């Protein structure tokens, strides 16, 4: 049957189950006839003895003739019975082998593939047919449970039939019973594994759990209500505990270890840690944990005092390096004709998870679990080593899917976006590029002069988009992933002046406004405002900054040709609703923060000698440093600019016969030959106390203008 399709195997197993049923009925009938024939032979033997004692030779002779005929008949019945036993043993063997093959395909291929897709879905890989595929898998679990159970019933019934049959000297009944017992044990093991493996986490918890926060998860028993299991589970609970991932790996190798781990290896506390298995209208037998909360997690013990062993220090893991798993287990229960010593102890494990106690740990926790979800095996096989390096192509797929999942953006990362990202993580000027390691991706500084890794930079951008720039990103109003140099060149090449939004690559989680102005000679000069973070945009939204900046008022287009006013109209009603009416409840006139970029038309060539305290340079008395100024990277007429805002808001009988049955059958009895069958992620503050920086204009509605200054290229 190797290479057969699942449907062919199902058909074959169904046919075997039906055949075994008919064979068992035939065997029962033949054994009954054989027992009756033996009883008749015993009666004839007594009759002959009585006739001989009474000296009635003619009657004795007739009785002997009748006995000879009966012996022939009984022998024929016995031969057919022996043949039926051989046939049913062979069929049961075939059925067990097919069931084992199907079970291996179901668990090791189909369910494994589903679980792996479930894992990848947690980093954004599409898995829209998750429920449909799992329902199809459940149908196969139910089919196997039914057929394995039926085969086991026939094996047990035949074994009981053989044990209650006349025990002849040929030992056929005894050997048949032994073989049937072996088959039954094999089928029992298959059933144990099937039920155990049918218990899965159908809805995984979030990859990163935070203490004192609720989490949602669901477990499901895929054999459904087969074998009458729902009634067996009426008084049982599904419980959940959190254990270390190291212990979960031990359990994957030594299943018996789960009892000891379950009892003694608790690393945290979970409220509402048990639920009942319930059957819904779709036939799903599941337990939903919707109100559970991780209330406590044990901290790692510090190294012993005075420990100087470097290995000891290396083995110590930070909170964001420690992985955990949720252990789900059902109260042990008995099933069918299994003995009390063979109760089912069913459990399953979630995928590895991370636990944080503070939002500051989220970036590191997210990257550790992201790498696992993308590249690690779900089997917890100790012989499978963790993936420490991957190609850029595989990493790009992970980043693209994680980006869409995390931000909720409809617009995915484009090929140009990914090309820009690759420049940030692939070491330049190396023709023989090696795979990208986890350390390079998540730990190592993105560039030597920076204090953050590629992941920290990318994660903070995802946070910025999710919280502040989602509409800009989805509508294409934010180019985002483009270098300052390329942005400057692109804007200067357009016939009209324009501005764009790009993510800073020298600061985490920040967006910069780049635009072009014309100098006295009519040449376009690019400027890039100091990057704005989430905190900055909390105080004054990006739309408000764009709308209020005088230098952007005459620029009609966002790069390349997007109508600025159309974009601003989208935010107008939203901003008006946020700000409220012109007067506050106390009768005060509200103030308004306005972003002003001070250009005043004072553009100088790069060759011009700058003054010590020119109007285009930041004052040395300001808290603003040169790092706040952003060069445009165009070789002529370069200028830099930072925007400085005034911060004014806070924002399932028969008895044996005569033992000497062989003498009753006579010399015509032939022992049939029995052939045995052998059998798985700031605004810079201007020093407002300095008189040179106090440039405010008072209007009727009290607008506060804080001026940006330029640093010449």
Curated annotation (Swiss-Prot):
Q: Which GO terms describe its cellular component?
A: cytoplasm; nucleus
State where the protein is found: Cytoplasm; Nucleus
InterPro entries for this protein: p53-like_TF_DNA-bd_sf, SH2_dom_sf, STAT, STAT_linker, STAT_TF_alpha, STAT_TF_coiled-coil, STAT_TF_DNA-bd, STAT_TF_DNA-bd_N
Where's the SH2 domain?
A: 477-574
Report which superkingdom the organism of origin falls in.
Answer: Eukaryota
**Keyword Translocase recorded:** no
Keyword terms: Activator, Cytoplasm, Developmental protein, DNA-binding, Nucleus, Phosphoprotein, SH2 domain, Transcription, Transcription regulation
> Which GO molecular function terms does the record list?
DNA-binding transcription factor activity, RNA polymerase II-specific; RNA polymerase II cis-regulatory region sequence-specific DNA binding
One GO BP annotation here? cell surface receptor signaling pathway via JAK-STAT
| Membrane spanning residue stretches | none
The record describes the protein's role as:
Carries out a dual function: signal transduction and activation of transcription. Activated STAT proteins play a role in repression of dauer formation. Neuronal expression is held in check by negative signals through the TGF-beta pathway that target the daf-3 transcription factor.
Assembly and interaction partners: Forms a homodimer or a heterodimer with a related family member.
Q: Which family does it belong to?
A: Belongs to the transcription factor STAT family.
Report what the protein is called: Signal transducer and activator of transcription 1
- Could you tell me which species this protein originates from? Caenorhabditis briggsae
Traced from the root, the source organism's taxonomic lineage reads: Eukaryota, Metazoa, Ecdysozoa, Nematoda, Chromadorea
């Amino acid at each position: 049957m190797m290479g057969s399709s699942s449907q062919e195997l199902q058909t074959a197993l169904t046919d075997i189950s039906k055949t075994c049923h008919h064979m068992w009925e035939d065997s029962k009938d033949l054994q009954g006839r054989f027992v009756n024939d033996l009883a008749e032979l015993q009666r004839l033997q007594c009759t002959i003895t009585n006739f001989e004692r009474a000296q009635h030779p003619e009657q004795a002779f007739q009785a002997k003739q009748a006995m000879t005929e009966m012996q022939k008949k009984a022998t024929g019945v016995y031969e057919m019975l022996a043949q039926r036993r051989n046939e049913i043993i062979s069929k049961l063997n075939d059925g067990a082998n097919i069931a084992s093959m199907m079970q291996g395909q179901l668990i090791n291929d189909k369910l494994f593939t589903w679980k792996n897709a479930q894992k990848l879905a947690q980093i954004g890989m599409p898995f829209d047919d998750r429920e449909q595929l799992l329902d199809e898998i459940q149908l196969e679990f139910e089919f196997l449970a039914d057929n394995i159970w039926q085969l086991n019933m026939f094996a047990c019934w035949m074994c009981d039939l053989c044990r209650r049959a006349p025990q002849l000297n040929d030992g056929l009944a005894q050997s048949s019973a032994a073989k049937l017992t072996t088959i039954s044990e094999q089928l029992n093991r298959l059933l144990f594994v099937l039920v155990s493996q049918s218990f899965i986490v159908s809805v995984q918890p979030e990859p990163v759990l935070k203490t004192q926060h609720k989490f949602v998860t669901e477990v499901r028993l895929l054999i459904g209500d087969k074998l009458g299991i729902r009634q067996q589970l009426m008084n049982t609970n599904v419980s959940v505990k959190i254990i270390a991932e190291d212990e979960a790996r031990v359990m994957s190798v030594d299943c018996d270890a789960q009892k000891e781990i379950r009892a003694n290896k608790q690393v945290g506390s979970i409220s509402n840690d048990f639920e009942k298995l319930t059957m819904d209208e779709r036939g799903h037998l599941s337990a939903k944990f919707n109100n559970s909360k991780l209330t406590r997690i044990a901290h790692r013990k510090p190294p012993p005092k005075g420990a100087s062993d470097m290995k000891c220090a290396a083995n110590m893991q930070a909170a964001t390096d420690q992985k955990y798993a949720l252990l789900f287990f059902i109260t042990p229960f008995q099933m069918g004709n299994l003995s009390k010593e063979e109760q089912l102890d069913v459990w399953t494990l979630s995928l590895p998870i991370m636990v944080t106690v503070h939002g500051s740990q989220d970036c590191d926790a997210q990257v550790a679990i992201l790498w696992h979800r993308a590249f690690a095996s779900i089997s917890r096989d100790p012989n499978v080593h963790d993936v420490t390096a991957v190609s850029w192509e595989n990493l790009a797929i992970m980043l693209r899917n994680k980006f869409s999942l995390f931000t909720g953006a409809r617009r995915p990362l484009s090929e140009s976006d990914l090309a820009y990202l690759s420049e940030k993580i692939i070491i330049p000027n190396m023709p023989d590029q090696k795979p990208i390691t986890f350390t390079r991706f998540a730990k190592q500084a993105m560039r030597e002069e920076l204090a953050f890794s590629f992941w920290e930079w990318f994660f903070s951008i995802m946070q910025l988009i999710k919280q502040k720039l989602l509409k800009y990103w989805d509508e294409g109003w934010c180019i985002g992933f483009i270098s300052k140099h390329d942005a400057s060149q692109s804007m200067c090449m357009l016939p009209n002046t324009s501005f764009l939004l790009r993510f800073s690559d020298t600061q985490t989680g920040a967006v910069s406004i780049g635009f072009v102005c014309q100098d006295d000679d009519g040449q376009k000069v690019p400027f890039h405002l100091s990057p704005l973070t989430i905190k900055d945009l909390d105080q004054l939204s990006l739309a408000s900054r764009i709308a209020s900046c005088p230098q952007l008022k005459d620029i009609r287009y966002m790069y390349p040709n997007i109508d600025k006013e159309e974009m601003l109209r989208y935010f107008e009603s939203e901003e008006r609703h946020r700000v409220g009416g012109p007067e506050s409840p106390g009768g005060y006139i509200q103030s308004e923060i306005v972003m002003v970029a001070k250009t005043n038309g004072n553009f100088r060539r790069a060759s011009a000698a700058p003054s010590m305290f020119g109007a285009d340079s930041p004052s040395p008395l300001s808290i603003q440093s040169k790092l706040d100024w952003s060069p445009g990277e165009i070789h002529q007429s370069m200028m830099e600019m930072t925007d400085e805002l005034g911060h004014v808001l806070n924002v399932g009988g028969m008895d044996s016969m005569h033992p000497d049955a062989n003498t009753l059958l006579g010399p015509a009895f032939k022992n049939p030959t029995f052939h045995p069958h052998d059998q798985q992620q700031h605004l810079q503050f201007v020093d407002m106390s300095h008189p040179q920086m106090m440039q405010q204009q008072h209007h009727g509605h009290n607008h506060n203008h804080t001026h940006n200054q330029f640093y010449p290229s």
